[in-house]
Amino acid sequence: MGQKVNPNGFRYGITKPINSVWFAEKQNYGDLLVQDAKIYKFFDKLVRKYQIGNTSIKRTKAQKVTVVLQTSQPAKLLGENGANIEKITQDLHKYLKNKSLDINLQVSLLKQPELNARLAAEAIAQKLENRESFRVAQKLVINDALRAGAKGIKTQVSGRLNGVDMARAEGYSSGEMRLHTLRQDVDFAKATARTIYGAIGVKVWISKGELLEGDK
């Protein structure tokens, strides 16, 4: 039987860059891995507010941590004269309970946010929380992605849709979506909509076409 695998994990190191880039000795590896997980969790909560499409972590031998945030709204994330990014850095230190950690937050512009699966999934989740139709929410995101140049897109929502007693999954797809072709540049993300009927899961797959050699 065929097994479903996360399209991102399937492509890491082959056609997708790895989000955490660092090396550690065996005795420190576990602590740094847990720290990475906490950093990702911290910025997951800020995705909607600042439209953060991707987060990556780099560490040097001197244990300097660089967190690169790709956002479609860099001015909002940075704040006036960088005041907001400084506050976020302080909040991150408190969250990690490590004020001595050398953390540097870098902000880069995310071009074509409509082709980012994470932002697309959060957009659908936000519409569901605002009591919009789950069908309309998915179709709007699909149309936006195709207009922005996506080769294919697939969406799925699952849970108590429209408040019915029995949970079910329903989705739409348009264009090409070859998940087993590693050359296919596929972005995948999940989000959760907290509604009065309970949690509704959202999944989005966006295909940007096939990668040629040297296009990683």
Curated annotation (Swiss-Prot):
Boundaries of every KH type-2 domain copy: 39-111
Q: Where are the transmembrane segments?
A: none
Gene Ontology CC annotation, any one: cytosolic small ribosomal subunit
Q: Name one Pfam family in it.
A: Ribosomal_S3_C
Describe the family membership recorded for this protein in Swiss-Prot or TrEMBL: Belongs to the universal ribosomal protein uS3 family.
Q: Which InterPro entries does the record associate with it?
A: KH_dom, KH_dom-like_a/b, KH_dom_type_2, KH_sf_prok-type, Ribosomal_S3_C_sf, Ribosomal_uS3_bac-typ, Ribosomal_uS3_C, Ribosomal_uS3_CS
Supply the SUPFAM superfamilies for this chain: Prokaryotic type KH domain (KH-domain type II) (SSF54814), Ribosomal protein S3 C-terminal domain (SSF54821)
Q: What role is this protein assigned? A: Binds the lower part of the 30S subunit head. Binds mRNA in the 70S ribosome, positioning it for translation.
Single GO BP term: translation
Cysteine pairings via disulfide bonds: none
Species this chain originates from: Mycoplasmopsis agalactiae (strain NCTC 10123 / CIP 59.7 / PG2) (Mycoplasma agalactiae)
> What's the gene?
rpsC
Q: Which PROSITE patterns match?
A: KH_TYPE_2 (PS50823), RIBOSOMAL_S3 (PS00548)
Q: Name one GO molecular function term.
A: rRNA binding
Kindly list the organism's lineage.
Bacteria, Bacillati, Mycoplasmatota, Mycoplasmoidales, Metamycoplasmataceae
| DNA-binding found in the keyword field | no
List the keywords (alphabetical): Ribonucleoprotein, Ribosomal protein, RNA-binding, rRNA-binding
Which NCBIfam families does the entry link to?
rpsC_bact
Name of the protein: Small ribosomal subunit protein uS3
> Quaternary state and partners of this protein?
Part of the 30S ribosomal subunit. Forms a tight complex with proteins S10 and S14.
Keyword Iron-sulfur in annotation: no
